[in-house]
Amino acid sequence: MGLSDGEWQLVLNVWGKVEADLAGHGQEVLIRLFKNHPETLEKFDKFKNLKSEDEMKGSDDLKKHGNTVLSALGGILKKKGQHEAELKPLAQSHATKHKIPVKYLEFISEAIIQVLQSKHPGDFGADAQGAMSKALELFRNDMAAKYKELGFQG
């Protein structure tokens, strides 16, 4: 299920655009996640009180967390599948502390794809979308395997 060198290049090319505004992209990804899947909001004590999109857009904490999420994901993507060291602490915290189900990782992957489609249509055509989808699936599968090792049935 690995990606070719060309596919990784497509992923990292569009990711360069994301890194120009990690916090802004991250905020949009989280807002889209919470709008499309309101049940995910319950996992975030800090954001549970944010009921409207305007409240979410005005939240510095949401923007900071979006930056954290996409910064971590970028570090993983740049490893081109060789992300064991980066993944282990992330899986540990998401399985044992935050109890984030794998399904929610699918939901945020969808939100990432949607935000990239809307913000970077010229750099995120069908090939880049396919490559990013594969990269995010690889990430999710590896997270799920780590969850299993940790005894978390998320």
Curated annotation (Swiss-Prot):
One of its GO terms (molecular function) is oxygen binding. Keywords: Cytoplasm, Heme, Iron, Metal-binding, Muscle protein, Oxidoreductase, Oxygen transport, Phosphoprotein, Transport. It is found in: Cytoplasm, Sarcoplasm. Residues 2-148 form the Globin domain. The modification Phosphothreonine is found at T68. The modification Phosphoserine is found at S4. PROSITE patterns: GLOBIN. Heme b binds at H94. It catalyses: Fe(III)-heme b-[protein] + nitric oxide + H2O = Fe(II)-heme b-[protein] + nitrite + 2 H(+); H2O2 + AH2 = A + 2 H2O. It holds the Pfam family Globin. One of its GO terms (cellular component) is sarcoplasm. O2 binds at H65. Nitrite binds at H65. InterPro entries: Globin (IPR000971), Globin-like_sf (IPR009050), Myoglobin (IPR002335). Its EC number is 1.7.-.-, 1.11.1.-. GO terms for biological process: removal of superoxide radicals. Its main location: cytoplasm. It comes from the Eukaryota. Monomeric. Monomeric heme protein which primary function is to store oxygen and facilitate its diffusion within muscle tissues. Reversibly binds oxygen through a pentacoordinated heme iron and enables its timely and efficient release as needed during periods of heightened demand. Depending on the oxidative conditions of tissues and cells, and in addition to its ability to bind oxygen, it also has a nitrite reductase activity whereby it regulates the production of bioactive nitric oxide. Belongs to the globin family. This is Myoglobin. It comes from Ochotona princeps (Southern American pika). The gene is MB.
